Amino acid sequence: HDFSLVPPADTMLDVLQQAGKSTIGVGKIHDIFAGRGMTEFTYTSGNTDGLAKTLAYADKDFHGLCFVNLVDFDMLYGHRRNPDGYAAALQEFDSWLPGFLEKLGEDDCVIITADHGCDPGYRKHTDHTREYIPMIALGKKIRPVNLGTRAGFCDIAATVTELLGVPYQTPGRSFAAELV
């Protein structure tokens, strides 16, 4: 488990929960946010379990956010500098994704990203690495558009809350209008 400090202010999860939206954590999301802002959460034993649990949530009718952490990318392959394991995990995810996307509703949006760089091929240390992280938005009504380099995760929080119709004061700039 991660033993995080309580966030000093309301997070996106807090404001969504306060607005009556579902905030579902899969993996260690509950721990990352010190147990705050979750209406429901489930731990996972690794990526394969996380993908299965995420697919199960896609079958449920909820209005809100399902926030997923696939920990093996970081814990088993990134920090352990295991590029072969990382590649196999990416292939597993790539094989899983089409079945998940088929389950999405008309207005659903999926944002795929990472929380930091963790190059499995970098050998000087096992800490986080400094490359930019990818962010991909998908959904039946999501337009394919280059969003450029974003300021940070605050842009994702601004976008998610706007898409869910919940006001949230954040330094982030929503890119919802560019997507839908």
Regions found by a protein language model. Give the residues of each.
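Feature captures the catalytic ectodomains and active-site-proximal regions of enzymes
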Residues: 1-180
